[in-house]
Amino acid sequence: MSAHTTAQSAQYNQSATQAALVPMVVEQSARGERSFDIFSRLLRERVIFLTGQVEDHMANLIVAQLLFLEAENPDKDIHLYINSPGGSVSAGLAIFDTMNFIKPEVSTICMGGAYSMGSFLLAAGEKGKRYALANARVMIHQPSGGAQGQATDIEINAREILKTRARLNEILAERTGQPVDKIEKDVERDYWLDAKEAKEYGLIDEVLERRPASL
């Protein structure tokens, strides 16, 4: 068996195990009994989970859920729970742009950790409705790249990374209220914050220990 096939098999087994561990919710109605996985049931309450690596497949699922909930009710808030190490910039920006595109306001709640693109999306929530649980951690840093190939291609990719970094810094400055030059300095290396520090920095608006009436 090739290394590629082995990796695919391991990934499939992991996905199958995770799927088997998803709790099911059974509801009774006049029409009978219906079963939902827990995430589908929470989606009915306008709750979306952004957990794990930010990549294209996950971004497509998040975007689809945002658009679906907008179609269901364009005037009611959506709650995006985040526990993510970050990932692809393009995938993250697809989610970010959709959050801004739709009519409902999107509140963001960090549980566990929001790092890299995860912290970017945490800050992207509706101002006044960005939260972190008491022991959550947040980390911001600059985008990374691993360009290979001819020297000219590497140079082109380097320019693109710098352009992307500048754009992300501008957005973070707007979302946090921090000067762009401070953002540029802070993201040069991994910049870690606890929940209280994330509030002081402007990445979130409130630290939560108990559920407020608005959530």
UniProtKB/Swiss-Prot annotation:
Its EC number is 3.4.21.92. It holds the Pfam family CLP_protease. It is found in: Cytoplasm. CDD domains: S14_ClpP_2. It comes from the Bacteria. SUPFAM superfamilies: ClpP/crotonase (SSF52096). Keywords: Cytoplasm, Hydrolase, Protease, Serine protease. The active site is at residues 116, 141. GO terms for molecular function: ATP-dependent peptidase activity; ATPase binding; serine-type endopeptidase activity. It is an enzyme of class 3 (hydrolase). InterPro entries: ClpP, ClpP/crotonase-like_dom_sf, ClpP/TepA, ClpP_His_AS. GO terms for cellular component: cytoplasm; endopeptidase Clp complex. It catalyses: Hydrolysis of proteins to small peptides in the presence of ATP and magnesium. alpha-casein is the usual test substrate. In the absence of ATP, only oligopeptides shorter than five residues are hydrolyzed (such as succinyl-Leu-Tyr-|-NHMec, and Leu-Tyr-Leu-|-Tyr-Trp, in which cleavage of the -Tyr-|-Leu- and -Tyr-|-Trp bonds also occurs). One of its GO terms (biological process) is protein quality control for misfolded or incompletely synthesized proteins. HAMAP family: ClpP (MF_00444). Cleaves peptides in various proteins in a process that requires ATP hydrolysis. Has a chymotrypsin-like activity. Plays a major role in the degradation of misfolded proteins. Fourteen ClpP subunits assemble into 2 heptameric rings which stack back to back to give a disk-like structure with a central cavity, resembling the structure of eukaryotic proteasomes. Belongs to the peptidase S14 family. This is ATP-dependent Clp protease proteolytic subunit.
